[in-house]
Amino acid sequence: MKSFIFRQNPRKQQQEQNNLVDYSDSDDDEECNDDIFVNNEIIINVSEKSSKDYGLFIWDGSLVLSWYLFTLTKNNPQFWNGKNVLELNAGVALPSILLSKLGVNKIIITDRIDGFIEIQNNIIDNLNLNGFNINNNNNINDNKIFIEPLSWGNFEKFSNQLTSSSIDYLITSDCFYDNTKNYDDIFATWYYFLLKNDKLVILLTYQVRCNEKTIFNYLKKWKLKSEILSIKDISIPNYNIDSEIILIKITKNQ
């Protein structure tokens, strides 16, 4: 059993000088429930599965991205209201669940076609844990949340929901690995949505794993504008952010 609790509770800060993060591990449990306290009002429950599929775990990049998305509401609590958001490579979909709580107009949660059913079922479980009524027919909360298969560069298999929706923000975390064969497929997918909306903002958390092959040359190749965003002010209580995680904002050159 592994569990962690993130608290950011202003009313308790005077009583508790330190926020609590609990970590425990046990090989006996096939499933663990993580309670992530995003602020005083939002509690997110996430279930991880013991599986060979890496898409069923919470990764550091997903945590960093989630907390950054939350910080955007610090000065404007309505920041996400009316926005349409697409999450690629979602895994357990922590950022999407958070955004659903923060008032997005529509969230489309996607992951690869290969192994999609298992990932989809885990996402459905997590959405249900957080009070969203969802079933396998994607009949979810008045067409607010959708779960769709999407493999990088496989445009002919994009669902109607993907091809017809106007996306304001595209978010993704930890999609580049040492064994990622073709970075161009990822960039082609981003570019597809940038062509549909040239004001689209892509937010990416990227963990440097291979110094010989980084995304920055590809950003130049695809002529995309990028900005490294500071994560020093992202406050994940008592959580040590991996120094190799980079948060990048990507837009289309105008």
UniProtKB/Swiss-Prot annotation:
Pfam families xref list: Methyltransf_16
Stretch list, region Disordered: 1-27
GO cellular component terms, A-Z: cytoplasm; nucleus
Native organism: Dictyostelium discoideum
PANTHER family: HEPATOCELLULAR CARCINOMA-ASSOCIATED ANTIGEN, HISTONE-ARGININE METHYLTRANSFERASE METTL23
Keywords assigned by UniProt, alphabetized: Methyltransferase, S-adenosyl-L-methionine, Transferase
Protein name per its UniProtKB record: Methyltransferase-like protein 23
Composition skew (Polar residues), residue ranges: 11-21
Keyword Transport carried by entry: no
GO term, biological process aspect, one: methylation
EC id: 2.1.1.-
Molecular function GO labels: protein methyltransferase activity
Protein function: Probable methyltransferase.
Keyword S-adenosyl-L-methionine: yes
Family: Belongs to the methyltransferase superfamily. METTL23 family.
